[in-house]
């Protein structure tokens, strides 16, 4: 991303879908779960692309269970997928591949939660608590290269879901898209 400019066509996914969740290594990008025209409740499919060249995605792996609207995290080796309407956290080793395996559980079932990571820890923040459908302010984390249940980290400055998140080696930002009343708010954590 060294220059400014408009986007260009990279390729196509293996299926028409929305509400999938993404994570990446330095060389590969992944899109897991999401709704398809034949299933509005999610899917188990995961597409993969190589960043180094344009081209269509390939079917790469299978989630343990049907998911949509989940938060993700990754480092250079593992990609994690959590939420999507359940407490299940699952992960994949991005190279060489294989299907997702069980990592542990979050404290409650979330959907539309947000995920981010440092090289060592994966975080989930906010979300819609299922089945109550109430906005969450929870922040939980896992140690990416181990397995186990998530650990309480703290709280977002405001409850919400369906937003965006991003992080680097030292900081993470959560933006809650759906909150009531609507606010202009970012939550900052030191990771």
Which role does the model predict for each range below?
Residues 48-50, 91, 141:
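Conserved blade-register residue in beta-propeller folds
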Residues 7, 17, 41-45, 57, ...:
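A detector of repeated loop/turn-to-beta-strand junctions in beta-rich toroidal repeat architectures
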Residues 1, 26-41, 51, 75-85, ...:
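Glycine-centered tight turns/hairpins at beta-strand boundaries that repeat
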Residues 8-12, 58-62, 100-105, 151-155:
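A short beta-strand motif characteristic of beta-propeller blades
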Residues 18-22, 68-72, 111-115, 161-165:
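Beta-propeller and closely related beta-sheet repeat lectin domains
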Residues 189-191:
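Conserved small/polar residues in nucleotide/adenosyl-binding loops
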